[in-house]
Amino acid sequence: MRLLRLNSSHAKMVLTSLTFVLAGSLPAQTTPSAPANGNLTAVPDASTSSPASGNATPPPVTTNGTTVLPDIVVTGREDDLVGTADSATQGTVGAKEIADRPVMRNGEMLETIPGVIITQHAGGGKANQYFLRGFNLDHGTDLAIDIDGMPLNLPTHAHGQGYSDMNIVIPELVQGITYEKGPYYAANGDFSSAGAAHITFFKSLPEDLVSLSVGMYGYGRAMFASSTAIGSGNLLYGGELYHDDGPWTHPDDYQRVNGIATYSQGDNDLGYSLTARAYHGTWNSSDQVATSAVDSGQIPFFGSLDPSDGGNSQRYSVQGEWHREDANSSTKVNAYAFYYDLDLFSDFTYFLTDDIHGDQFEQKEHREVAGLNASHTIYGKLFGREMENTFGLQVRNDWISDGLFQTEDRNEINKIDTNPADPNFGQVIPATIKQDAITQTSAGLYYENKVQWGEKVRTVLGLRYDLFNFDVHDEDPANSGDKLESLPSPKGTIIFGPWDKTEFYLQGGLDYHSSDARAVTQTTNPDASPIGGTVNGLVPTKGAEVGVRSSAIPHLQSTASLWYLHSNFDSEQLFDNDSGIATTDGQPSERYGVELANYYTPTDWLTLDCDWGDSWAYFDRPDGDGGKMVPEAIRQVVSAGITVHDPSGWSSSLRLRYFGPRALISTGAAYSSSTSLLDWQVRYKLNEHCEFTADVFNLLDRRDHDIDYYYQSQTSPGAAPQTEVHFHPVEPFQMRFGVNFRY
């Protein structure tokens, strides 16, 4: 077929029509531009005008009394990284790629990273569940996420270790996402074993923006952003109001308010920025439900077994950034502080423990955080070869108050264990299960060396050293304690090439994630079950990877990688945030897989992309069920799309997302279903100031599962407990319509 060679408007109309009916496509991968300063620094941040990454917005220019903001240069997937990237699985997603994707939930922006899957098993205000590289990452355990250098992950969180809530992000203000996968980057510390995503926000806008949208199931959203010159700098401010009920029989009634203000000054060589953010959200929670409850007609497909589940959360932050760069060196400093709280009500087992009052519980948290990131890079030569030496420091302190309580209809209440199979059958379960005051302090030092040894050989060597202090004050003095731990993490990469616009990568490294501080010091469980001894607060991982990146075919960016990761989880004490119970049942596991990504732009109006990955995850030895498969570990994932931009103002994007079946228990006796979704976006630019949008989600109205679990529950009082699949359904076919005003 010669269609891709046509330049006529007729060909564009044909391909625009094709997006209405096609589910697949060709190629995908995200890539940023080469560094402008000619140094060895590989993938720059998502924009050449991002103060958070050491590149500030240039100062405004005044002409004839009118202040004009500078042009903003955004990098993206089509950029060629051959010769600059340190890995085949490193890249940048630009604002244009994010805008061209139909996104139902903010967290789905991260699905622009090849291999990442985002799901949800509860109400919209709860953090998403992340999957990558053979991991069910829960709410962020091994995926480090930051916004303008401020960490999003929360250690020792009331609900889950490394909890990362993307609801604080306003998508239109995201300038780009830079990502790295694997334990090979000295600057990435806690929670980065599977990967890291760095989200960069605009510091100025070329024009003001107002966006209004409405849709099915009670969806509505209003957003505005404005950028203006103040003195020799720029002030950007914006906000968002959001509401969504969802298709659930008991509406989510998710309400979200976001606000941001950023003042920036300077240029790429010298500048700073100050940013304040605020987020508040409240919601009802449509938690996962038992398959038998749906099959028997007890509840409908979009029903709930405990309609009083839900929660609320707030996060308020301030941060400042300063940078400078010259021909000899560069320095970046980023300081931040934020307040966070969460009040979450959940019920996953319904009446298994107490068939009178039910099994709902509350997880409550208040947290204050302060931290600093600083790095200094020296540009020089080694035996006449170009060299960079980077020295970095990252410090953080979390003051945390966590609580776990028994509740009914969101009211704290004493309960009675009515399950004859429980060792505490007939005993009173107090309303307060566990309360802790925690101070967690971390400091990370790192060094990275880059040398261009010859025309075809580069190396990147790094060493990171982390120090953590876990200080826990529990209501039970036996579970209180103060523990200091440290861990070195060497890393290395060799890059060969390029030959014919193709280069090869060989990587290896060590990394880690921190344990929940309560697990580090806990010696007795709320149910008096044994723990089995103390364990490490820092859980090491090690990995290796071989990869290739090529732009040999014109307009096609392609990468391929084979990777391996081993997690030493037998040194980790597992802490169940839902029960307050700690065990030493963790055991080491290994994961390995393959990833292919392609991004093809044959013309300036057509983009085709496709990512594919497969991974395998096994315990080193059989677990208690007798199997070696890691439950819920991600297997196959496919993301593919076709995007057309017509000069007449029309654009369209059709995307396919496939999330393959996963073993739900180690023996493979129970598997999840696969999920295949087709989403479609159409945009029409009426003029320079007005644009209309339409997003269609789950175009084929498939009744798939967003996520699956396998465990025991009891769906009603007096019913027999069942061990079965529990699932949260994907949302059905729905449409959202919007209008954007720029002025």
Predicted regions and their residues:
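Membrane-embedded beta-barrel scaffold of Gram-negative outer-membrane proteins
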Residues: 321-323, 330-346, 497-513, 519, ...
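Short acidic/polar hinge/loop motifs at secondary-structure boundaries
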Residues: 150-181, 200
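Extracytoplasmic beta-strand/coil segments of soluble accessory domains associated
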Residues: 90, 107-154
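C-terminal beta-signal and adjacent terminal beta-strands/loops
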Residues: 98, 608, 661-662, 684-743
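Face-selective signature of the C-terminal outer-membrane beta-barrel domain
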Residues: 271-277, 311-474, 554-562, 601, ...
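Transmembrane beta-barrel wall of Gram-negative outer-membrane proteins
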Residues: 214-243, 248-286, 308-328
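N-terminal periplasmic "start-of-domain" segments of outer-membrane beta-barrel proteins
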Residues: 40, 46-56, 70-104, 126-129
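Gram-negative outer-membrane beta-barrel transporters
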Residues: 375-379, 455, 459, 468, ...
